[in-house]
């Protein structure tokens, strides 16, 4: 049984008896953002198929429309963009609002910094205004950017005076695709070469897409360094967005923990910088098979067939973390149902996401009966202890909300989840799909 009150935003879930069928995974959020941005910066027309229709990409589209790009109505079939050219964004008449999207705000700062002679003000919702922006503002300032805001320019709202930039070699203290992508985008309009070296490889969607649009990009996997040469001309492209493996991960865990389940997840992006969760779940004993492996628009994808399985604990740390950072909340759910102990370390980044995801998962899984110890940079979860239904909260974080829905499917008794609607940020159809798979009537 699954009931949802839209008036109070409370979702009530009961244990599932088996999940069977097929699921089409929504478009990859990271790729959707980048396609909208590069299409807006390119000359000519860009078409995007399979765009994620969540709230975050809508925020990106709204910002770039305000900056002068001609973007058609968003849909998953085909979005058309008539770009303005790399350095030709217009000065908007109002504040640019990134909503809840850290990707929108951080990457946009890199783009706006080099728009010489124009002034921009950017902000976001309450959650985004509390998230750290210094990690991109500091290196942008080293390139010559003029950015001001609260707490020394480390918190939104922020003001940007576009100007001339110079390439730098930035050694990032953390493996962050957002930091890397922000600086590469700034480097498109900078004098000389901009290089970013990371301690571990982060997701590489920006590099792949920038190259496809015509940017002069070099990647050195051995030194974990990416370089872009300023002055490139971007040309509109056809972009096919694969399914988001971060969204697929909820179903991979749900099927693994609910007995007598089998799902086929179609057209899932399998970029090797994003498949850490897949590898970890297989190490834990999950029954996951990759079918119909192929490549589309420079991105590998395939179908995933997953069946119920007995899971065992493992260690998740080190260079694995950047490849599964968004999936850690639902991997914590898998750990609670696995035999033995699972240790998650090197994930302090999760404390400054839409919520403090480490604290949120420790708190909410504990309410359901899990034994969870919290570290400054991770969690230790003693699995194999049956979870029970409880009142839990999403912390207004889409990934926490969906992770707790998955946990409820395998728990004993009913679970009441407050703040379920935020799942729409990255997966608008998650609750309706869950309703279909559990054959539950949805009541508002």
UniProtKB/Swiss-Prot annotation:
Keywords: Amino-acid biosynthesis, Aromatic amino acid biosynthesis, Cytoplasm, Transferase. One of its GO terms (molecular function) is 3-phosphoshikimate 1-carboxyvinyltransferase activity. The active site is at 326 (proton acceptor). SUPFAM superfamilies: EPT/RTPC-like (SSF55205). InterPro entries: Enolpyruvate_Tfrase_dom, Enolpyruvate_Tfrase_sf, EPSP_synthase, EPSP_synthase_CS, RNA3'P_cycl/enolpyr_Trfase_a/b. Its EC number is 2.5.1.19. It comes from the Bacteria. One of its GO terms (biological process) is aromatic amino acid family biosynthetic process. It catalyses: 3-phosphoshikimate + phosphoenolpyruvate = 5-O-(1-carboxyvinyl)-3-phosphoshikimate + phosphate. Phosphoenolpyruvate binds at residues 29, 102, 131, 178, 357, 399. It is an enzyme of class 2 (transferase). Coiled coil: none annotated. Pathway: Metabolic intermediate biosynthesis; chorismate biosynthesis; chorismate from D-erythrose 4-phosphate and phosphoenolpyruvate: step 6/7. 3-phosphoshikimate binds at residues 29-30, 34, 176, 178, 326, 353. PROSITE patterns: EPSP_SYNTHASE_1, EPSP_SYNTHASE_2. It is found in: Cytoplasm. CDD domains: EPSP_synthase. One of its GO terms (cellular component) is cytoplasm. Monomer. Catalyzes the transfer of the enolpyruvyl moiety of phosphoenolpyruvate (PEP) to the 5-hydroxyl of shikimate-3-phosphate (S3P) to produce enolpyruvyl shikimate-3-phosphate and inorganic phosphate. Belongs to the EPSP synthase family. NCBIfam families: aroA (TIGR01356). This is 3-phosphoshikimate 1-carboxyvinyltransferase. It comes from Synechococcus sp. (strain JA-2-3B'a(2-13)). The gene is aroA.
